[in-house]
Amino acid sequence: MKPISPLIIAVWVLVSGIVGFGYSTFAVNNGLEVPISGITLALSTALIAVVLLGLAVPIWKYKRSITKALTTSKPLPVNPFYAVRVLLLSKAAAITGAMLIGWHAGVLVKQFTAPVVVTDATTPNITALVAAVLLLIVGFVVEQICKLPSDKSKDE
């Protein structure tokens, strides 16, 4: 499976940023409020990132024990289906993080360019933006953890 391209992530950020800015502009022009993310979105996004990192720990331990030869006995292998599920979850988390980053960045640009900046409306969106960045970073890190080590027998 190919790793996620940074170009794909950038496209998701750009597209969702345009949508976030466009919807915010549409809402304000029609007398509605600027969309504000609840604090629960930031908390649940951060929790998903922590859980994903926790799911990758057994894979990281197994990979480390193989590459560094910390034990004399062969380590217990990780279920390959488990590893694939964690890998797919990390890819989904990275793309979701990119979409949330773009959305919140677009909304924040609209909020900061408004004639009156309401601090109560920007704080939850900034918090959600930080949580989305965390989710994106964890998605990339876990994807690297799930990468197979190079086979040394092919090199010889």
Regions found by a protein language model. Give the residues of each.
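Long, highly hydrophobic alpha-helical transmembrane signal-anchor segments
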Residues: 1-49, 105, 112, 119, ...
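Membrane-helix interface/capping segments
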Residues: 56-83
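Alpha-helical transmembrane segments and their immediate juxtamembrane interface regions
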Residues: 2-3, 114-155
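Hydrophobic alpha-helical membrane-embedded segments
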Residues: 39-61, 136
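Alpha-helical transmembrane segments and their membrane-interface junctions
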Residues: 94-114
